[in-house]
């Protein structure tokens, strides 16, 4: 019987030349691997992607990130090689790919990147004990159910702000350069450590729910004949 690979997290982030994962291309990818206790293992990975000649960047994205097509043309890998490097990191057995808003954005960037370069866009998400997770939803869950131990900032509208840079500033977490992929990854790991330290049971419960089987198990506890409350947070 094949041994189960040890769990590790690949905390990662993209900076892109636009906000549409289907159309816009990645400019930068950064990742840090940690063990299950959030201790860093290995060296950080940071890559630039050489822009395609027929893909126009959004000027606003370049202004936000400070990453220009010229910089990526000089330092970047061809997209096929960039995609292979990203896929190899995420596909390592036992890896949980995780970021901040990664389910809605970064994972979609990865899927379209792999598809364009003739690589399986889904295998690294489930094969070999792998999975994916999103710390943004964990932060929202902690705010709603177990807010103690974390400072929750508010935006100009008076509502809770879950922007990574706001949470990092409110909690004294290092975040040297918002919209730099490696800086965003380090801030995400720091926030994960804070939530895990403050609310370990909630953290572990949310982590378990990355599995469809665990979600199905939770739902199977609900009996239609009996009134049951089911809370959805997103």
Predicted regions and their residues:
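Non-catalytic pre-domain segments flanking phosphatase-related domains
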Residues: 1-5
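Two-metal-ion RNase H-like nuclease active-site motif
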Residues: 7-17
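Metal-dependent phosphoesterase core characteristic of DEDDh/y 3'-5' exonuclease domains
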Residues: 7-8, 23-29, 33-35, 39-67, ...
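Ser/Thr-centric signal marking residues that sit
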Residues: 16-17, 34, 65, 228
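Short N-terminal binding/cap micro-motifs at the start of the first secondary-structure element
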Residues: 18-22
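Metal-dependent phosphoesterase signature
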Residues: 64-82, 89
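Polar, glycine-rich mid-to-C-terminal structural blocks
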Residues: 211-217, 221
């Amino acid at each position: 019987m094949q041994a189960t690979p040890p769990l590790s997290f690949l905390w990662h982030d993209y900076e892109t030349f636009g906000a549409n994962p289907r159309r816009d291309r990645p400019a930068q990818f950064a990742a840090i691997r940690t063990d299950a206790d959030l201790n860093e293992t290995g060296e950080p990975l940071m890559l630039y992607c050489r822009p395609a000649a027929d893909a126009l960047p959004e000027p606003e994205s370049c202004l936000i990130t400070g990453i220009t097509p010229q910089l990526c043309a000089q330092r970047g890998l061809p997209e096929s090689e960039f995609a292979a490097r990203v896929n190899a990191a995420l596909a390592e057995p036992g890896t949980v790919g995780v970021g901040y808003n990664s389910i809605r954005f970064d994972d979609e960037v990865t899927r379209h990147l792999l598809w364009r370069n003739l690589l399986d866009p889904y295998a690294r998400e489930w094969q070999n004990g792998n999975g994916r997770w999103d710390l943004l939803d964990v932060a929202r869950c902690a705010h709603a159910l177990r807010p103690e131990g974390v400072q929750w900032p508010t935006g100009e509208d008076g509502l809770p702000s879950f922007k990574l840079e706001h949470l990092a500033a409110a909690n004294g977490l290092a975040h040297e350069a918002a919209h730099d992929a490696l800086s965003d990854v380090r801030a995400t790991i720091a926030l994960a450590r804070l939530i895990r330290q403050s609310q370990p049971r909630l953290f572990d419960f949310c982590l378990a729910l990355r599995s469809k089987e665990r979600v199905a198990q939770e739902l199977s506890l609900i009996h239609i004949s009996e009134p049951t409350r089911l809370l959805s947070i997103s």
